[in-house]
């Protein structure tokens, strides 16, 4: 037996129709098992696929489960914003509400031209100040290209490396073996900022390869957390990501006096459909109805 599940395709952090970070949203995913959600994420083979369930928190409108093709994430920015875009239309939600993630509750804000999430979580910071040659080899750069190295977690733990020039950001070459050794199942976020514009790149591992992500909200939140710890707030930055892989993403990052981190961007709907999920693994498909 095949059960149809509706999905929506959206581009998050997009300012052009084929820009942004693509996302599949399943707005009614109750009934899917963890294994089925993982297999569906692998089928779509996007950086993440998000599944919406009834919430277990009375203050939240829905619960999100976020999967890469290889594993589940406790939190990720572009799936949260993309799911919010779909749910806001389907459920006629107010301009501000809460969504539940595996990392906790996230507050969403719908503004005139974009959707933002706000975090006020505990920020874990581990600054790396030794073994610099290992990181220069990881990036294929020199020591003078690196300004700061730190592990940050505002919802998803990632390695952030600040670079000293835009050229270093554009020309770095990631060493796959060292990436697997140092970053493992986390992500590497490289950033350079000048005059309130941050240019960034994010890399993650998938099936033994190093893949570049076009737009990453959780890493932008971690960047805000690092700036908060470094005393660089309040701030209002525009983030450029994805240009090196011809998939331009544009994000906003704000940190206010209350130490709340806001990450936002525009969302463009590009498609929808149904996926037929078998009740038993290996059941033959009966095709479209």
Curated annotation (Swiss-Prot):
Key words of the record: Isomerase
Isomerase recorded as keyword: yes
GO-annotated molecular function: isomerase activity
GO terms, biological process: biosynthetic process
E.C. no: 5.1.-.-
Broad class of enzyme this protein falls into: isomerase
Pfam (any one): PhzC-PhzF
GO cellular component terms, semicolon-separated: cytoplasm
Entry annotation: catalytic residues: 48
SUPFAM superfamilies in alphabetical order: Diaminopimelate epimerase-like
Family, per entry: Belongs to the PhzF family.
PANTHER family reported for this sequence: ANTISENSE-ENHANCING SEQUENCE 1, PHENAZINE BIOSYNTHESIS PROTEIN
The protein's name in its UniProt record: Uncharacterized isomerase PM1503
Organism for this UniProt entry: Pasteurella multocida (strain Pm70)
């Amino acid at each position: 037996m095949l059960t149809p599940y509706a999905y929506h395709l959206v581009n998050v952090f997009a300012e052009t129709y084929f820009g942004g970070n693509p996302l599949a949203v399943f707005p009614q995913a109750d009934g899917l098992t963890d294994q089925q959600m993982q297999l569906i994420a692998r089928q779509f083979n996007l950086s993440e696929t998000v599944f919406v369930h009834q919430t277990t928190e009375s203050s939240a409108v829905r619960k999100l489960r976020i999967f890469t093709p290889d594993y589940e994430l406790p939190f990720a920015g572009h799936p949260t914003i993309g799911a919010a875009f779909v749910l806001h239309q389907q459920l006629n939600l107010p301009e501000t509400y809460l969504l539940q993630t595996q990392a906790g509750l996230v507050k969403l804000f719908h503004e005139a031209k974009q959707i933002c999430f706000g975090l006020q979580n505990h920020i874990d910071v581990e600054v790396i100040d030794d073994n610099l040659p290992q990181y220069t080899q990881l990036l294929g750069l020199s020591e003078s290209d690196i300004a700061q190295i730190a592990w940050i977690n505002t919802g998803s733990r990632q390695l952030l490396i600040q670079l000293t020039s835009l050229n270093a950001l554009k020309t770095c070459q990631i060493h796959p073996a060292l990436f697997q050794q140092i970053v493992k199942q986390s992500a590497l976020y490289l950033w350079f900022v000048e005059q309130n514009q941050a240019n960034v790149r994010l890399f993650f591992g998938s099936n033994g390869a190093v893949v570049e992500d076009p737009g990453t909200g959780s890493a932008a939140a971690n960047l805000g957390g690092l700036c908060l710890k470094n005393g660089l707030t309040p701030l209002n930055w525009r983030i450029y990501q994805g240009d090196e892989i011809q998939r331009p993403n544009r994000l906003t990052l704000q940190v206010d006096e209350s130490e709340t981190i806001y990450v936002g961007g525009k969302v463009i709907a590009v498609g929808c459909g149904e996926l037929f999920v078998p009740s038993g693994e290996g059941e033959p498909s009966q095709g479209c109805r």
